[in-house]
């Protein structure tokens, strides 16, 4: 892992392009809709004044500087977990400080996933709507929004369809395309800004404060909801830390920020130059980004912005896979199938998540129909994620011995700033923001049910000392009157204690049908706070037939239990801890490892369980959700192994028994 980490930290032309293609898709496409959202929200071009434009530019500049540059690039990026970033990586760094920190992690993760469903719809629709300005398009289709919707649906459907095959090949063009995109943004901005350099006065925070109280600002304080769209990609920047490394972000962000600001300033210059152009008054969804292009450049502008939007969408889709995968490993989300279409680091494909994202994006496009309506709903959930990150970051700063006053200043300053954006975005709730809130609440509910159900079950399960059954297992092992069930009989246990397992496991071995084996394996898998841990410990209890294994795997490690267990068996045989398992019949010469049989216990809630009504509902809901998750066999990489599934009643809480009384006639 150290080699892998050092390789992504290297600064090369390739790493520079990869960073552009992976990290900045979301924030890099914000010029498509930020100015458009603010101008149209304030009443259109006819309501714009120079002071208003200076104030808007100042707000954008200082929002990007304070939130993206200072909070995320300079402070939060240092909170990496062995090179990995993101809200769940941050949570793993601090979760031992307080149990309640799981709440901001779950809330922030849910909101980030909800944002991932809106972003592809917003960016692709905003770019395709640029076609309306093309004379040739207008001549054929007029102002027909249905055509735009059809094109957007086709692009999004194609994007989700190709996920199954992996994006390694097309991913190679992401960096060069985004380089062209940012260069295009900068050049377009410079051309329009020339002759209007007085707009650079907007770098003073004076104008940002002044506009909030200006009568020219018809939105008042709520203008911050539109301004916030310029920095929504900051959280994604932190999440992608593990893909490109901190040094590459330090190198590329200043260049990206300059390109973005040049474009915003260029749009502002165009707006002021056209504010008396009555032909543009009343234009629905006026977009300065496309309007400021000369007619001969429009087609290229639409094409390159569409490609940038697709790349941004791909980054959000891949980020969603990674986010869910981390949540699963932390036991915050139901187990879903993970596929690896290529050998590239971070190339995960989750069919269930892909289908959900596709359906959600299509539904969002069909419901909102235009980027204007989507922008009105966009950004609300990501403010919640940023607030939750600030809470976790505060605890991380305390963990690394940052003086309490400094940590408090950081929390209060950025927390207040983000809370202001949250309040200003709250007006979006009735305009469509409720969609992202509902999505986030649905995801949060699933997380809550899953983790709460786990805690309820773990608190009530009956654990027993393995050594109490040492003699019985030895007798069963040597009982030649019984047919051998397996050479290696393997059970999965949730007990992290080296000498204990669940009673139901021993019940399966001894009571249900005595299972004779040479070696009984009890395997416990622990997901560590570090991303790429791969360690194990064993306890043989002084025997050669009874082994408790504890696998410690990082939260990004694929849990290939079959592969790991064979490696452990070979090492124990070589060390003399267990006997050589010679096979009389085999196609492999010198094979000294016997066969394996895995017993997977399927829990069914017993009618005898007597739980509090709320806990009972949680357990039933979790078992219902479990029906739609990937099977333990697939999750632990046992598809090609010999497995047997046993149904065991899950009896939780107190039980009530009715005693039958025999009646004699």
Curated annotation (Swiss-Prot):
It comes from the Bacteria. It is found in: Cell membrane. InterPro entries: K+_transporter, K_trans_C, K_trans_N, Kup. GO terms for molecular function: potassium ion transmembrane transporter activity; symporter activity. It is a multi-pass membrane protein. The chain crosses the membrane at residues 15-35, 48-68, 100-120, 147-167, 173-193, 219-239, 251-271, 292-312, 348-368, 378-398, 403-423, 431-451. GO terms for cellular component: plasma membrane. It catalyses: K(+)(in) + H(+)(in) = K(+)(out) + H(+)(out). Pfam families: K_trans, K_trans_C. Belongs to the HAK/KUP transporter (TC 2.A.72) family. Transport of potassium into the cell. Likely operates as a K(+):H(+) symporter. This is Probable potassium transport system protein Kup. The gene is kup.
């Amino acid at each position: 892992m150290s080699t892998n980490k050092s390789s992504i930290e290297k600064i090369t032309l390739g790493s520079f392009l990869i960073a552009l293609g992976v990290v900045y898709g979301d924030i890099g496409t914000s010029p498509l809709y930020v100015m458009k959202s603010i101008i149209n929200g304030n009443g259109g071009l006819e309501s714009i004044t120079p002071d208003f434009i200076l104030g808007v530019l100042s707000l954008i500049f200082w929002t990007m500087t304070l939130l993206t540059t200072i909070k995320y690039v300079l402070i939060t990026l240092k909170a990496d977990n062995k090179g990995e970033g993101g809200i769940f990586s941050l949570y793993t760094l601090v979760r031992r400080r307080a149990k309640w920190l799981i709440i901001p992690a779950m809330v922030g993760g849910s909101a980030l996933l909800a944002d991932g469903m809106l972003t592809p719809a917003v960016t692709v629709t905003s770019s395709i709507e640029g076609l309306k300005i093309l004379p040739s398009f207008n001549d054929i289709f007029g102002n027909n929004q249905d055509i735009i919707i059809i094109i957007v649906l086709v692009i999004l459907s194609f994007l989700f369809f190709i996920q199954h095959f992996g994006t390694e090949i097309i991913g190679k063009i992401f960096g060069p395309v985004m380089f062209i995109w940012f260069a295009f943004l900068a050049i377009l901005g410079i051309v329009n800004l020339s002759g209007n350099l007085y707009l650079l006065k907007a770098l003073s925070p004076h104008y940002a404060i002044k506009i909030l109280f200006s009568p020219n600002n018809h939105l008042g304080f709520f203008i911050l909801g539109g301004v916030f769209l310029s920095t929504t990609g900051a959280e994604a920047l932190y999440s992608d830390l593990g893909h490109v490394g901190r040094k590459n972000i330090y190198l590329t962000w200043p260049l990206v920020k300059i390109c973005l600001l040049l474009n915003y300033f260029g749009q502002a210059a165009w707006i002021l130059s056209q504010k008396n152009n009555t032909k543009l008054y009343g234009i629905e969804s006026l977009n300065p980004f496309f309007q400021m292009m000369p007619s001969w450049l429009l087609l290229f502008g639409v094409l390159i912005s569409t490609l940038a939007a697709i790349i941004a969408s791909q980054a959000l889709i891949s980020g969603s896979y990674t986010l869910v995968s981390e949540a699963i490993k932390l036991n915050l989300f139901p187990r879903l199938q993970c596929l690896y279409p290529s050998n590239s680091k971070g190339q995960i494909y989750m069919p269930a998540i892909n289908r959900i994202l596709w359906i959600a994006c299509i539904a969002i496009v069909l419901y909102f129909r235009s980027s204007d309506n989507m922008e009105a709903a966009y950004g609300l959930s990501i403010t919640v994620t940023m607030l939750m990150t600030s809470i976790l970051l505060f605890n991380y700063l305390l963990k690394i011995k940052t003086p309490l006053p400094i940590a408090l200043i950081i929390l209060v300053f950025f927390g207040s700033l983000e809370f202001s954006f949250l309040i200003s975005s709250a007006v979006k709730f009735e305009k469509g923001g409720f969609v992202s809130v509902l999505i986030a609440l649905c995801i949060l509910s699933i997380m809550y049910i899953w983790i709460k159900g786990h805690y309820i079950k773990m608190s009530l399960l009956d654990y027993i000392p393995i050594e109490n059954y040492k003699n019985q297992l030895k007798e069963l092992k040597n009982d030649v009157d019984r047919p051998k069930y397996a050479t290696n009989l393997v059970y999965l246990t949730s007990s992290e204690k080296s000498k204990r397992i669940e009673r139901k496991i021993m019940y399966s071995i001894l009571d249900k049908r005595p299972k004779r084996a040479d070696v009984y394996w009890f395997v416990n898998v622990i997901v560590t706070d570090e991303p790429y841990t791969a360690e194990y410990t064993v306890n043989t209890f002084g025997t050669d037939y009874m082994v408790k294994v504890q696998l410690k795997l990082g939260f990004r490690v694929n849990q290939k239990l079959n592969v790991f267990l064979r490696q452990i068996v070979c090492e124990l045989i070589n060390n003399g801890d267990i006997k050589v398992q010679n096979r009389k019949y085999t196609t492999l010469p010198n094979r000294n490892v016997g066969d394996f049989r895995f017993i997977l216990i399927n829990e069914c809630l017993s009618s005898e369980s007597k739980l509090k009504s709320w806990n009972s509902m949680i357990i039933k809901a979790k078992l219902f959700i479990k029906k739609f998750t990937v099977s333990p066999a697939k999750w632990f990489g046992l598809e090609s192994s010999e497995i047997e599934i046993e149904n065991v009643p899950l009896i939780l809480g107190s039980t009530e028994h009715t005693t039958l009384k025999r009646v004699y006639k």
